[in-house]
Swiss-Prot record:
The lineage of its organism: Bacteria, Pseudomonadati, Pseudomonadota, Gammaproteobacteria, Pseudomonadales. GO terms for biological process: methylation; rRNA processing. Catalyzes the 2'-O-methylation at nucleotide C2498 in 23S rRNA. PANTHER family: RIBOSOMAL RNA LARGE SUBUNIT METHYLTRANSFERASE M, RIBOSOMAL RNA METHYLTRANSFERASE FTSJ DOMAIN-CONTAINING PROTEIN. It catalyses: cytidine(2498) in 23S rRNA + S-adenosyl-L-methionine = 2'-O-methylcytidine(2498) in 23S rRNA + S-adenosyl-L-homocysteine + H(+). The active site is at residue 300. This is Ribosomal RNA large subunit methyltransferase M. It is found in: Cytoplasm.
Length: 354
């Protein structure tokens, strides 16, 4: 139970190790991080009993940037037959669980295991329920079984309210056929990640205004229009006719880094390919000068020192807003639909309600 196991995007194992090591050092939890390149996972092995539990207790999962999912526990080797009996014996010292997720890694090997997991879940679930190890109770911890192979599994536990929203941290979003580009799924995932579902009507309402900087062809604009917002799309490139036909979009041929609205808007979204430091300056201007209430902005990452650069820019934003004496909440996550980038959500907390 003294290893913290984390899923991530393939190629970002080093960023997960750097991030969790920094948090562990700050909290005084001794141990070491390890990973294999392109494995889509990383581990933090705690050297003291209770270290992994303390990390999960002190950290909020939604404040971590690069991990997609986490659980504390240990690896178990399974026989070719009667895997369920071995798992039941391993779970004797675990608490009673309120839910069960079987997970695989986001790799070719992981995809090959997904069929096995689907077939294995039904008999395993029945056996756990019969043994009194699994009950229908959302307040109880979640049992997370991350299969590395059919014979090797990480048996882990995580609080349901302090871990990923979806198995493996991968949302099941359907690409809308009428959307102009697949990038639309990035913004839809961001809504789920950063805004509690019960607040959507209030914060993503059809009486709101939005700006999409670098909008062409309209993947992110589509999400704003879908919520019924009036949108100003800023881009020198063309917009999809289907969006213009809605009557909700005004397309202005302008530079997303210099254009500003005459009146403050509710939302600013931006997915421009640019150096992250310049995009950070854009965020500081829009939130700092009250040009928008909330924003979702993607930061494109450098090739090296990616976690260090993201951390530096987030700290810079925080210092900038503090110096301006304004209250802004800042969240950042590498979403499943992100590539070499992270998504930031910012919200002014000191403006009067609409």
């Amino acid at each position: 139970m003294n290893t913290l196991f984390m899923h991530c995007r393939p190629g970002f194992e080093g960023e997960v190790c750097a991030e969790i090591s920094e948090h562990a050092a700050r909290l005084g939890v001794s141990g070491y991080a390890k990973s294999k390149p392109q494995s889509a996972s990383a581990e933090f092995v705690c050297s003291e009993e209770g270290g992994a539990e303390r990390l999960m207790g002190e950290l909020r999962f939604n404040q971590l940037i690069f991990p997609r999912q986490w659980a504390r526990g240990g690896f178990v080797e399974l026989p070719e037959t009667d895997r369920i009996s071995v798992l039941l014996s391993q779970l004797a010292d675990f608490p009673v669980f309120g839910s069960l997720w079987l997970e695989v890694l986001d790799s070719n090997e992981g995809k090959e295991l997904s069929t096995f997991c689907r077939k294995f879940e039904v008999p395993l679930r029945k056996a756990l329920e019969k043994a009194g190890r699994l009950v229908d109770d959302a307040s109880r911890p979640r049992l997370l079984l991350s299969f590395i192979s059919g014979r090797r599994v990480f048996v882990g536990v995580a609080p349901a309210n302090n871990s990923a929203l979806w198995p493996m941290g991968i949302p099941r979003l359907k690409f809308p056929r009428e959307a102009p580009s697949r990038s639309t799924l990035k913004l839809e995932e961001a809504w789920h990640q950063f805004i509690p579902r019960e607040q959507w009507e209030q914060r993503l309402g059809d009486d709101m205004t939005g700006v999409d900087l670098g909008a062409s062809p309209g993947g992110w604009t589509y999400q704003l229009v879908r919520r019924g917002m009036l949108v100003t799309a800023i881009d020198n490139g063309p917009m999809a006719e289907s969006l213009m036909d809605t009557g909700l979009v005004q397309h202005l041929m302008a530079d997303g880094f210099t254009w500003q609205p005459k009146q403050p808007v509710d939302w600013m979204v931006c997915d421009i390919v640019e150096k992250p430091a310049r995009t950070t300056s854009l965020i500081e201007t829009w939130l700092g000068e009250g040009l928008c209430r909330e924003a979702v902005v993607n930061l494109k990452l450098p090739m090296k020192q990616r976690y260090a650069e993201v951390r530096r820019l987030l700290d810079r934003m925080e210092a900038t807003f503090k110096a301006r004496k304004i209250r802004v909440s800042i969240a950042c996550k590498q979403l499943y639909h992100d590539r070499e980038e992270v998504t930031c959500h910012l919200r002014r907390l000191d403006l009067k309600p609409r």
